């Protein structure tokens, strides 16, 4: 009986691995129609008896402002071009910070955030962390860095029910994602740690200060020229 259950478990695991690889390969070329986080937000609204309309319009790489691309990297993951999905230094710093108590600091890279938003549910269980690591590794192996950032910008939450750069630009500033200014992009990047509480359109003093920091980091990174590094970053042969 135990041997039978073990064989079934191994077979299920193999099917999951094959299926997840095929899904990640497909999404390298096909825009994701939605995300697990969007489904979760919709279910939450039904449970709370407060239905929301999800706003999201996919925009390809060339129709998103370079200002926003650089701002997000500057604010969220400055080692994005170099790492393979995990920032070990940031993880170690977060562990030390969290051991000292107080607020919990995260250390998620853009690649990890893509895997969470696309495929997983909210929470901090070991199972979820393991699946996050698995999908992050697959994304880094099979997607170029530019694709990872493109999917991130089209999937990340920027307010209650507002997902992706185009919806965020329209919602907060009344412009398209292609026309976001440096100031607007820095404000959108500044609220990403807590987009359902902080507002890019009505920024608090803290958000304004953080946006100023993001702009300084953008300048230090080299502005739009920094995006050229995405084409020169470390990638596996399969991501070429």
Curated annotation (Swiss-Prot):
- In short, the EC number is 2.4.99.28
Keywords (alphabetical) are: Cell inner membrane, Cell membrane, Cell shape, Cell wall biogenesis/degradation, Glycosyltransferase, Membrane, Peptidoglycan synthesis, Transferase, Transmembrane, Transmembrane helix
- Which organism encodes this protein? Pseudomonas fluorescens (strain ATCC BAA-477 / NRRL B-23932 / Pf-5)
Q: What is this protein called?
A: Biosynthetic peptidoglycan transglycosylase
Q: Name one GO cellular component term.
A: peptidoglycan-based cell wall
Kindly give the NCBIfam families that the UniProt entry links to this protein: mono_pep_trsgly
Q: Which GO terms describe its molecular function?
A: pentosyltransferase activity; peptidoglycan glycosyltransferase activity
Which SUPFAM superfamilies does UniProt cross-reference here? Lysozyme-like
Q: Name one GO biological process term.
A: cell wall organization
- Family to which this protein belongs: Belongs to the glycosyltransferase 51 family.
Q: Give the matching InterPro entries.
A: Glyco_trans_51, Lysozyme-like_dom_sf, PBP_transglycosylase, Pep_trsgly
Transmembrane residue ranges:
12-31
Name the membrane topology term. Single-pass membrane protein
Catalysed reaction per UniProt? [GlcNAc-(1->4)-Mur2Ac(oyl-L-Ala-gamma-D-Glu-L-Lys-D-Ala-D-Ala)](n)-di-trans,octa-cis-undecaprenyl diphosphate + beta-D-GlcNAc-(1->4)-Mur2Ac(oyl-L-Ala-gamma-D-Glu-L-Lys-D-Ala-D-Ala)-di-trans,octa-cis-undecaprenyl diphosphate = [GlcNAc-(1->4)-Mur2Ac(oyl-L-Ala-gamma-D-Glu-L-Lys-D-Ala-D-Ala)](n+1)-di-trans,octa-cis-undecaprenyl diphosphate + di-trans,octa-cis-undecaprenyl diphosphate + H(+)
Metabolic or biological pathway? Cell wall biogenesis; peptidoglycan biosynthesis
Q: What does this chain do?
A: Peptidoglycan polymerase that catalyzes glycan chain elongation from lipid-linked precursors.
What is its subcellular localisation? Cell inner membrane
Q: Which PANTHER family match?
A: BIOSYNTHETIC PEPTIDOGLYCAN TRANSGLYCOSYLASE (PTHR30400:SF0), MONOFUNCTIONAL BIOSYNTHETIC PEPTIDOGLYCAN TRANSGLYCOSYLASE (PTHR30400)
Q: Which Gene3D superfamilies is this protein grouped with? A: Biosynthetic peptidoglycan transglycosylase-like (1.10.3810.10)
